[in-house]
Amino acid sequence: MSRPVRAALLLVVFIAACGGSATAKDPLADRVEHLEEHGFEAREVEPRGDPLPEAMAVVQLDGAEATIYAFATGDEAQRAASAFAAEEQAAPERVRVQREGTNVYVGRAPAGDELPAVDFEDVVFTSEELH
């Protein structure tokens, strides 16, 4: 085996040992790309919140938006979904929360508007159909 081939092989083994591809470290990259392929305007944003998600993405809806929170564990996702549920109960026509595994989807419309529920469900379905 030549030296360049051996170096390339070692690099591949090293990358795999360090966690694999970039998308393995970014749990929403594939979902955002898939949503965009289906006509949604989606982008990743800086994660924030308590518990802190591993990644976050925002999807534009007709006069509203859906936020996808990707958590490391199901327990963190459940804790976040429970916290968002209070917001949903206070304004059920404006806010919708749905948990799928370690992901939490939150649809929000501005005050005085109504969340386009079908659009929100389309975001969840399109995002989840990959997995």
Q: Where in the sequence are the language-model features?
A:
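C-terminal motif of bacterial Sec signal peptides marking the signal peptidase cleavage site
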Residues: I15-A17
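An anionic, turn-rich surface loop/hairpin at beta-sheet edges
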Residues: R48-P53, Q78-R96
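A short, solvent-exposed beta-edge/loop patch
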Residues: Q89-H131
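Bacterial signal peptide processing site
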Residues: G19-A22
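Bacterial N-terminal signal peptides that target proteins for export
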Residues: M1-A8
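Short secondary-structure junctions
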Residues: E36-G49, D122-L130
